[in-house]
Amino acid sequence: MPPTVRQGIRTVGTLRVTRPSSYVLSSREFSVLNRPPPNYPGHIPLTTIERGALAVGSAIGSLLNPRRADLIAALGEATATPYFIYRLRDAMLSNPTGRRILRDRPRISSKTLSVEYLRSLPPNSVGRTYVSWLDREGVGPDSRETVRYIDDEECAYVMQRYRECHDFYHAVTGLPIVVEGEVALKTFEFANTLLPMTGLSMFAVMRLKPEERERYWELHLPWAVRSGLASKEVINVYWEEELERDVNELREKLGIEKPPDLREIRKMMRRQKKAAEAAREKYQN
């Protein structure tokens, strides 16, 4: 074999494939020990692998314990990018009220909403309905987790706004915070916002009792899909400006159909169950 050919073979045999220097540099810059600076206060940048792990872990954890609001919040942030939270942000940008919300950046908390003022409003007003729901469920406006894992600062606010408005959705629909009520409301939110977390939360229906699952499939699922698709996008509601409006008028304006009172249904079912047990014991004795 000619020397030049042998030399060429040796040269090919010693070739090494190297990554572009820019790729190596970016990988070094974005490691667990050396992250890029946050884009806003409290922001925690994540790699694609970390975001996937967060999504899987929080999904499993929240399914095992649907009351873990922190895991549900993490699941919402991990699955909202790269598409869905931008779609929701664009829906706000295409709406005059949504644009004002993005410009004003209002927050919903006990510091921005006076509970005393809300209780002074007419019984059928949005504000009174909201505070009455808070009192009945034993919760407050400060219970929402702060967004940390969404990279875009404006989209982080959109997620925060959705999160802080969640209790208004509860109040307007009348759904309680029991797992059955949360699954029904999350189904409505999925049809209305398309956020993946709201759709994934529907898997919690597996943890419901048989009679609750039957009620979900026959009553709440059809209501949620019908009302969620037909109503205007609730992310564009400036709730702070609707507090004095009649709640039925707002439902009609948004196209939201109120479902049957779930708490009353559950109370009635418990009474019927107790009556049946009492009758059975009386018959046996």
Curated annotation (Swiss-Prot):
Q: Where in the cell is it found?
A: Mitochondrion inner membrane
Q: Name one GO biological process term.
A: ubiquinone biosynthetic process
Q: Which InterPro entries match?
A: Coq4 (IPR007715), Coq4_euk (IPR027540)
| Lineage, top ranks | Eukaryota, Fungi, Dikarya, Ascomycota, Pezizomycotina
| Keyword terms, alphabetized | Lyase, Membrane, Metal-binding, Mitochondrion, Mitochondrion inner membrane, Transit peptide, Ubiquinone biosynthesis, Zinc
According to UniProt, the reaction catalysed is: a 4-hydroxy-3-methoxy-5-(all-trans-polyprenyl)benzoate + H(+) = a 2-methoxy-6-(all-trans-polyprenyl)phenol + CO2
Topology in membrane: Peripheral membrane protein
What's this chain's function? Answer: Lyase that catalyzes the C1-decarboxylation of 4-hydroxy-3-methoxy-5-(all-trans-polyprenyl)benzoic acid into 2-methoxy-6-(all-trans-polyprenyl)phenol during ubiquinone biosynthesis.
Q: Which residues form a coiled coil?
A: none
**Which pathway is it part of?**
Cofactor biosynthesis; ubiquinone biosynthesis
Q: How does it assemble?
A: Component of a multi-subunit COQ enzyme complex, composed of at least COQ3, COQ4, COQ5, COQ6, COQ7 and COQ9.
According to the UniProt entry, what is the EC number of this protein? 4.1.1.130
User: Which cofactors, by name?
Assistant: Zn(2+)
Residue sites binding Zn(2+) per the record: 166-167, 170, 182
User: What is stated as this protein's family in its record?
Assistant: Belongs to the COQ4 family.
- GO cellular component terms listed in the entry, alphabetical order: extrinsic component of mitochondrial inner membrane
Q: What is this protein called?
A: Ubiquinone biosynthesis protein COQ4, mitochondrial
Q: Where is the transit peptide?
A: 1-11
